[in-house]
Amino acid sequence: MVYGLIKAMLTPILWLFFRVRVTGAENLPQSGGLLIACNHQAFCDSLFIPLVVRRRVTFVAKAEYFESWKTLWFFRAVGQIPMARSGGTASQKALGEALEVLQSGGCIGIYPEGTRPPDERLHKGRTGVARLALAARCQVVPAGIRGTRAVQPIGARMLRPFKPVEITFGKPIDLSARYGDRLEDPLVLRQATDEIMFEIAQLSGQAYVDRYASRGAQAAEEARLAAADGSKLAAYVDAQPLDRSMARSQLA
């Protein structure tokens, strides 16, 4: 009820003060579990997308939005789900709540980048989006949003009116038809996520960079890769027939 009331109040304002153009709305199924995966340019993305989609959209939003009273009331009122970017139990709980919504035939909105990127490029997607889609066996509609960074630059509290905003919805993707229920296979999750990010890049017109938008996530990825490289190096050295101390000095 609160969601519908807020939407009814804000929709006329949206169309009055912002030059919004929506393309591909016909690609959005009107029933059944649906996951909308979109690039993230500004805080107001979570305002524009629900207002142009007929169905109720429950967004998986970063937990920081629920820590300030300035944004807490809005996200709670419209039933959004807080996602801790640190991962672990809190993140699994958020994905579990989102899965329940999808399995009950609802619509979830998610930003695979995990946060707003520091520049205008599309950054590497986190695999939770693929895990969620495969677990729910639902369709994924990629979406590209343009212009919201100009409407609300990073750090800006107020929206700048009369700026053009373009939202494009792509064709639905059925990951389950391609990967079945292999949601515990990290290679499958990575490939499926990259497929989604490719479609988002096509729709948003952004250049893609194979790097996480979050510094913490990127640091963790680099540490994981470094550890993997270290393990390979140790295995290589141990397999050599020559003196190991000499081999280590040669490979350093």
Protein language model annotation of sequence segments:
Residues 1-19, 219, 243, 251-252:
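N-terminal membrane-anchoring alpha-helices
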Residues 6, 15, 29-90:
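Catalytic core of membrane glycerolipid acyltransferases/transacylases, capturing the structured
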Residues 13-15, 74-75, 101, 132-133:
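A generic structural signal for well-ordered alpha-helical segments
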Residues 15-22, 90-92, 149-152:
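Short gly/ser/thr-rich secondary-structure transition/capping motifs
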Residues 21-31:
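Membrane-interface helix-loop junction between the first two transmembrane segments
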Residues 24, 39, 61-62, 79, ...:
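A secondary-structure boundary/capping signal
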Residues 26, 63, 84, 144, ...:
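Residues at the C-termini of beta-strands that transition into short coil/loop
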Residues 92-252:
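Non-catalytic C-terminal accessory region of glycerolipid acyltransferases
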